[in-house]
């Protein structure tokens, strides 16, 4: 009986970890983590937005993202980019990311990957209102 209860208790914790990791908030990724996510064989759908610390529009956009996060069936990730980045590994990862997303012209930029693929109509640049994000 003790073994059964112990197994049930362990299963409960295991299954609890199967839900969204960060309920109600986007998950920050490094450029390298974004590349890993893009190469994920599961081909999950997710949204990625790119932002910066010194960007008023980005700060306001994060509030909009937090409003819609609970209403989305997919994970939302974000990448904070420093335009003056000097780390060569990060620069290389950002360049590789831009092969998939295209050149990032302005911040914030939003990309919706449907089953691992990015369609041109799923790339948006600049601040978006809540209604535009949920289309």
Spans of model-derived segments:
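Bacterial signal peptide processing site
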Residues: 19-21
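Local sequence-structure signature of Cys/Sec-based thiol-disulfide redox active-site neighborhoods
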Residues: 36-74
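Non-catalytic, surface beta->alpha helical segment in thiol-disulfide oxidoreductase systems
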Residues: 103-135
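Solvent-exposed loop/turn segments at secondary-structure junctions
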Residues: 53-56, 82-86, 117-119
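Structural recognition of the beta-strand scaffold that forms the well-ordered cores
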Residues: 47-49, 76-80, 109-112
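Positively charged n-region of N-terminal signal peptides that target proteins for export
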Residues: 1-4
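Thiol-based oxidoreductase modules, predominantly thioredoxin-like and allied folds used
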Residues: 74-93
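C-terminal motif of bacterial Sec signal peptides marking the signal peptidase cleavage site
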Residues: 14-17
